Amino acid sequence: MPPLDDESLLRRSFTVARRAQARGNHPFGAILVDASGAVLLEVENGYLPDHDMTGHAERLLATAASKKFDPTFLAGCTLYSSAEPCCMCAGAIYWAGIGRLVYGLSERRLKTITGNHPENPTLDLPCRTVFAAGQRPVEVVGPMLENEAAAIHAGVWQGETKS
């Protein structure tokens, strides 16, 4: 089987993030692909409409994947995320059994963009640190295409919070 086209698939997660933003949500998106690169799930950030602070795209995707697919299958899948998953999302990816992660924007760079915005409090706990504490491997690739990923957030986190 040929290797996955990580850049194209990651850009698809960027498209999902832009779609979330166009719908008034935070600009984060995630997709899940199988070993052949077939897209299985696409999930936007789910903060709105209920102001769910745990409605991160990666966590929502991991939950949906764990309900739909067997962990043995998920071990061969890749999650593409527009930004590095936070520790909550990394835990969800780990517990779902997803075997590989590719992300765009690093958590540290995201924090420089969002500052101390109340809708995006950031923990300095990289996903690699979370995965390293586990008993099964999760391959991590990223940051990748970080400037493209950062551009999605231009002008989003300044000024008033979303209602």
Regions from the PLM with identified roles:
Residues 1-20, 94-163:
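Zinc-dependent deaminase
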Residues 40-47:
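Short beta->alpha transition motifs characteristic of CBS
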